[in-house]
Amino acid sequence: MVKFPALTHYWPLIRFLVPLGITNIAIDFGEQALNRGIAAVKEDAVEMLASYGLAYSLMKFFTGPMSDFKNVGLVFVNSKRDRAKAVLCMVVAGAIAAVFHTLIAYSDLGYYIINKLHHVDESVGSKTRRAFLYLAAFPFMDAMAWTHAGILLKHKYSFLVGCASISDVIAQVVFVAILLHSHLECREPLLIPILSLYMGALVRCTTLCLGYYRNIHDIIPDRSGPELGGDATIRKMLSFWWPLALILATQRISRPIVNLFVSRDLGGSSAATEAVAILTATYPVGHMPYGWLTEIRAVYPAFDKNNPSNKLANTSNTVTSAHIKKFTFVCMALSLTLCFVMFWTPNVSEKILIDIIGVDFAFAELCVIPLRIFSFFPVPVTVRAHLTGWLMTLKKTFVLAPSSVLRIIVLITSLVVLPYLGVHGATLGVGSLLAGFVGESTMVALAACYVYRKQKKKMENESATEGEDSAMTDMPPTEEVTDIVEMREENE
């Protein structure tokens, strides 16, 4: 067997990240399979794609914050009691999300958000609200899955997490194929992707829960002892989680905001519907080469030696922060290469859209420029993921909150200003998303610099204090000093 000594320190990182990267790519493939389920409906395919895209992006806004509870499981859950607290938080969050789904589907609030704000016609608006109602139970299932995924990642079961996500996608593809041959294609085409989404989530959630009970439940204590930092409180979990949730919520609300401004910019015409459909098709394809980079933020908490549970579990771990930095840079370079190969090589991106999603060539050509803009996303995404992981390790996530605010400000500013420069449609949407990413990453970098300076100053103060203590220790006892002084006085 050929061995590579230079890669010895990187194999644990590769084994950990590859399944997570596959997970992220698998999710994008799942979205494309769902889009194909709609595109296969020849009648009103563009309208159906736009309706589902609006509903799905709004739903992701609610499920986004819950998926970040994966990081709570990764950092905080050391016992059965900790897990019970994390699950309780997610049950409450899932119930709240379901209530919001119902309100938007049936109340005037939903009519205003979807029909009025997005300037879509009555047909698209009613289909979108109906799809949103059908998706009401999804946030709860997604939350349960991500909570257990975080616990599994803490114990280095990233392969199992990856298998669960791949099973999710396989289930989606299979059920899309089955339902396309059912009566739903004629009666309620929207249910084809939605039911497939539910079946995939059910498979993923079941796999992760069974994996937890088989591999982890019996080996973790009922309560966390002092060597593991004690029991985590719900307050600590929520204090750690809310900045990450806010960031992910702004990331997820970015798509609905983009859809809103793009649709309003084109006046709710057929061109607006086409632009939203293009965005719906290009999001998963454009996200595929760089989306897995976000999983880099799980590397620091999983391998950091200052984490009490890692000290116990990884006594032979030789991964250092320098190895993590080099590994992160290589991942970014790989992602950039993939983006430029996929989106700048002639006819490759069109072929992906035609073969995977099932759109026609004319529609695929309209997606080329937005996809090329996605080529520049890996740089800000890598910077954000790497620094976020470091801050998660220090449990200093509160400094990340301003980055989400700046992202929204930059995003909306771009959506308002770029049309005056002649940029419209899907190009306007993706270009503004890139500007938002750059703004967010810049703020995360500034926050990391602030924390680094505080940590450095704290270490210097501790070193100075230890030096003073050492000097005091080297001094002779007070009684001895007194005796010496008295002896000198007697001699004089």
Curated annotation (Swiss-Prot):
<dbReference type="Pfam" id="PF07260">
    <property type="entry name" value="ANKH"/>
</dbReference>
<dbReference type="GO" id="GO:0140928">
    <property type="term" value="P:inhibition of non-skeletal tissue mineralization"/>
</dbReference>
<dbReference type="GO" id="GO:0030500">
    <property type="term" value="P:regulation of bone mineralization"/>
</dbReference>
<dbReference type="GO" id="GO:0030504">
    <property type="term" value="F:inorganic diphosphate transmembrane transporter activity"/>
</dbReference>
<dbReference type="GO" id="GO:0005886">
    <property type="term" value="C:plasma membrane"/>
</dbReference>
<feature type="transmembrane region" description="Helical">
    <location>
        <begin position="159"/>
        <end position="179"/>
    </location>
</feature>
<feature type="topological domain" description="Cytoplasmic">
    <location>
        <begin position="453"/>
        <end position="492"/>
    </location>
</feature>
<dbReference type="GO" id="GO:0030505">
    <property type="term" value="P:inorganic diphosphate transport"/>
</dbReference>
<feature type="topological domain" description="Extracellular">
    <location>
        <begin position="348"/>
        <end position="350"/>
    </location>
</feature>
<keyword id="KW-0812">Transmembrane</keyword>
<dbReference type="GO" id="GO:1904669">
    <property type="term" value="P:ATP export"/>
</dbReference>
<keyword id="KW-1133">Transmembrane helix</keyword>
<dbReference type="GO" id="GO:0046716">
    <property type="term" value="P:muscle cell cellular homeostasis"/>
</dbReference>
<feature type="topological domain" description="Cytoplasmic">
    <location>
        <begin position="1"/>
        <end position="85"/>
    </location>
</feature>
<dbReference type="InterPro" id="IPR009887">
    <property type="entry name" value="ANKH"/>
</dbReference>
<comment type="function">
    <text>Transports adenosine triphosphate (ATP) and possibly other nucleoside triphosphates (NTPs) from cytosol to the extracellular space. Mainly regulates their levels locally in peripheral tissues while playing a minor systemic role. Prevents abnormal ectopic mineralization of the joints by regulating the extracellular levels of the calcification inhibitor inorganic pyrophosphate (PPi), which originates from the conversion of extracellular NTPs to NMPs and PPis by ENPP1. Regulates the release of the TCA cycle intermediates to the extracellular space, in particular citrate, succinate and malate.</text>
</comment>
<dbReference type="GO" id="GO:0055062">
    <property type="term" value="P:phosphate ion homeostasis"/>
</dbReference>
<keyword id="KW-1003">Cell membrane</keyword>
<feature type="transmembrane region" description="Helical">
    <location>
        <begin position="404"/>
        <end position="426"/>
    </location>
</feature>
<feature type="transmembrane region" description="Helical">
    <location>
        <begin position="132"/>
        <end position="152"/>
    </location>
</feature>
<keyword id="KW-0813">Transport</keyword>
<dbReference type="GO" id="GO:0071344">
    <property type="term" value="P:diphosphate metabolic process"/>
</dbReference>
<feature type="transmembrane region" description="Helical">
    <location>
        <begin position="430"/>
        <end position="452"/>
    </location>
</feature>
<dbReference type="GO" id="GO:0010467">
    <property type="term" value="P:gene expression"/>
</dbReference>
<feature type="topological domain" description="Cytoplasmic">
    <location>
        <begin position="211"/>
        <end position="326"/>
    </location>
</feature>
<dbReference type="GO" id="GO:0016020">
    <property type="term" value="C:membrane"/>
</dbReference>
<protein>
    <recommendedName>
        <fullName>Mineralization regulator ANKH</fullName>
    </recommendedName>
</protein>
<feature type="transmembrane region" description="Helical">
    <location>
        <begin position="190"/>
        <end position="210"/>
    </location>
</feature>
<dbReference type="GO" id="GO:0005347">
    <property type="term" value="F:ATP transmembrane transporter activity"/>
</dbReference>
<dbReference type="GO" id="GO:0030282">
    <property type="term" value="P:bone mineralization"/>
</dbReference>
<feature type="region of interest" description="Disordered">
    <location>
        <begin position="458"/>
        <end position="492"/>
    </location>
</feature>
<feature type="topological domain" description="Cytoplasmic">
    <location>
        <begin position="153"/>
        <end position="158"/>
    </location>
</feature>
<feature type="topological domain" description="Cytoplasmic">
    <location>
        <begin position="372"/>
        <end position="403"/>
    </location>
</feature>
<dbReference type="GO" id="GO:0035435">
    <property type="term" value="P:phosphate ion transmembrane transport"/>
</dbReference>
<feature type="topological domain" description="Extracellular">
    <location>
        <begin position="180"/>
        <end position="189"/>
    </location>
</feature>
<feature type="transmembrane region" description="Helical">
    <location>
        <begin position="351"/>
        <end position="371"/>
    </location>
</feature>
<comment type="similarity">
    <text>Belongs to the ANKH family.</text>
</comment>
<dbReference type="GO" id="GO:0071529">
    <property type="term" value="P:cementum mineralization"/>
</dbReference>
<feature type="transmembrane region" description="Helical">
    <location>
        <begin position="86"/>
        <end position="106"/>
    </location>
</feature>
<dbReference type="GO" id="GO:1904383">
    <property type="term" value="P:response to sodium phosphate"/>
</dbReference>
<dbReference type="GO" id="GO:0005576">
    <property type="term" value="C:extracellular region"/>
</dbReference>
<feature type="topological domain" description="Extracellular">
    <location>
        <begin position="107"/>
        <end position="131"/>
    </location>
</feature>
